[in-house]
Amino acid sequence: MVRIRLMRLGAKKKPFYRVVVADAKARRNGPFIEIIGTYNPKTDPPEVNLNMERVNYWIDKGAQPSDTVKKLIERVSA
C-alpha cells in the first residue's frame, strides 16, 4: 500500500517536513516515490505548500494520506 506522509527534516527542536508518497512499509525517512509538498510548523502561521494536482493524482491511484496529511490537505483546500 502507498501512503502520503511526512518525512522529518531540520535540526533538533526545529522540525521541517516534506510531504512524500512512500510505501507504507518504508521507514519514516526511508525511500520515497515522490515529494509533493512541504510543511514548516515553526513559522507563524505554519507554512504548508502542497502540489494539489499531484495529491489528487496519488489519492485517485489509491494512496492513503496519514491523519496529519489529511488535516494539511483540508487546510490548503479551505
From Swiss-Prot:
GO molecular function: structural constituent of ribosome
Keywords associated with the record: Ribonucleoprotein, Ribosomal protein
GO annotation, biological process: translation
Family under the similarity heading: Belongs to the bacterial ribosomal protein bS16 family.
This protein's GO CC annotations: cytoplasm; small ribosomal subunit
Domain of life per record: Bacteria
The UniProt record lists the keyword RNA-binding: no
Gene: rpsP
Organism: Thermodesulfovibrio yellowstonii (strain ATCC 51303 / DSM 11347 / YP87)
Designated name of the protein: Small ribosomal subunit protein bS16
The keyword Ribonucleoprotein appears for this protein: yes
Any Pfam family matching the protein: Ribosomal_S16
HAMAP family referenced in this protein's UniProt entry, alphabetically: Ribosomal_bS16
